[in-house]
From Swiss-Prot:
Involved in the biosynthesis of branched-chain amino acids (BCAA). Catalyzes an alkyl-migration followed by a ketol-acid reduction of (S)-2-acetolactate (S2AL) to yield (R)-2,3-dihydroxy-isovalerate. In the isomerase reaction, S2AL is rearranged via a Mg-dependent methyl migration to produce 3-hydroxy-3-methyl-2-ketobutyrate (HMKB). In the reductase reaction, this 2-ketoacid undergoes a metal-dependent reduction by NADPH to yield (R)-2,3-dihydroxy-isovalerate. GO terms for biological process: isoleucine biosynthetic process; L-valine biosynthetic process. Residues 183-328 form the KARI C-terminal knotted domain. Belongs to the ketol-acid reductoisomerase family. Binds 2 magnesium ions per subunit. Mg(2+) 1 binds at D191, E195. NADP(+) binds at Y24, G25, S26, Q27, S51, S53, D83, E84, K85, Q86, G134. It comes from Hyphomonas neptunium (strain ATCC 15444). Mg(2+) 2 binds at D191, E227, E231. Keywords: Amino-acid biosynthesis, Branched-chain amino acid biosynthesis, Magnesium, Metal-binding, NADP, Oxidoreductase. This is Ketol-acid reductoisomerase (NADP(+)). Residues 1-182 form the KARI N-terminal Rossmann domain.
Length: 339
């Protein structure tokens, strides 16, 4: 596995080019601001008409243009609008204005891997994917650090696709931590699996089930919140810092023993069998097709599930308890008024 660091990338390449960041959400705001702070002078944010993000981007000192105008102007287009919106936006606002030698970049391989976007052969197509949310990418950059990232080349029409992609990755801070060379397929499938089975789907359902079990047994919701949600960060921080063994070194023997005897009762062979089915749905395109169809119908199921989750009792309890933790409100990663 090839890993690139600061010395492997020439930041002057991206500094000489005209760069448009399409979208200004979690990833878009971090990419645009990190590029700007890294000396990329010719940078614009491309947004659709009426976008609520326009004021945020302009307040940050960034020039905002239409997506079509960005496609005509830029040498490098980083497409960071939500996955479900990219294909239509590309077909209507980007593809008609492309010229030979331009460089299309993506922060996630979803649309390329599942052939929802099929770029013409005379443009470069690459991936520069930070391994973390945009708010964390920006925070780490400002602290002088960086997030690990991934790089992949789908098309190299000019012969310089990799050099430019590495230069871009350096400008957003990824080479400070290391950039791993991969493929669009590998990035897409592992990313989706990690999100669904572990990081978002798995953890959230485990937290909810634990909380509900304690509350239904008569324990105070506040105690259930602390034990099943709040302390998750404390444990994950230890794992993040030095692995599972590092976490086990820090916790009590009682907690460690409980990990060994109880963990396998909850996550067992049946769980792993279901995980393999989840991976198969990702690999064969079932998940992608379902997500595309959901959005073509206006995403009614998605919005209903989002509403149910935001209305879960753990959210109300958490909001009340977090209001008591003033120290936890300092240096917030997410400030919805700015990013």
């Amino acid at each position: 596995m090839k890993i690139y660091y600061e010395k492997d990338a020439d930041i002057s390449l991206i500094q000489k080019l005209k760069v448009a960041v399409v979208g200004y959400g979690s990833q878009g705001h971090a990419h645009a601001l990190n590029l700007k702070d890294s000396g990329v002078k010719q940078i614009k944010v491309a947004l659709q008409e009426g976008s609520a993000s326009r004021k945020k981007a302009e307040a940050a000192g960034l020039e905002v243009v239409s997506v079509a105008d960005a496609a005509k102007w830029a040498d490098v287009l980083m497409i960071l609008v939500p996955d479900e919106k990219q294909a239509v936006l590309y077909a209507n606002e980007i593809e008609p204005h492309l010229r030979a030698g331009q460089h299309l970049m993506f922060g996630h391989g979803f649309n390329i891997h599942y052939n929802l976007i099929r770029p013409r052969a005379d443009v470069d197509v690459s991936l520069s994917a930070p391994k973390g949310p945009g708010h964390t990418l920006r925070n780490q950059y400002q602290m002088g650090f960086g997030l690990p990232g991934l790089i992949a080349i789908h098309q190299d029409a000019t012969g310089s696709a990799q050099a430019v992609a590495l230069s871009y990755s350096k400008a957003i801070g990824n080479t400070r931590a290391g950039v791993i060379e991969t493929s669009f397929r590998e990035e897409t499938e592992t990313d989706l699996f990690g999100e669904q089975a572990v990081l978002c789907g798995g953890i959230v359902e485990l937290i909810k089930a634990g909380y509900e079990t304690l509350v239904e047994a008569g324990y105070a919701p506040e105690m259930a919140y602390f034990e099943c949600l709040h302390e998750t960060k404390l444990i994950v921080d230890l794992i993040y810092e030095g692995g599972i063994a590092n976490m086990n070194y820090s916790i009590s023997n009682t907690a460690e023993y409980g990990e060994y005897v109880t963990g396998p009762r909850l996550v067992n062979a049946e769980t792993k069998k279901e995980m393999k089915k989840v991976l198969e749905d990702i690999q064969n395109g079932t998940f992608a097709r379902n997500w595309v169809l959901e959005n073509q119908a206006g995403a009614p199921g998605f919005h209903a599930m989002r509403q149910r989750m935001s209305s879960h009792p753990i959210e109300e309890v958490g909001e009340k308890l977090r209001g008591m933790m003033h120290w936890a409100q300092n240096d917030r990663l997410v400030d919805k008024s700015r990013n």
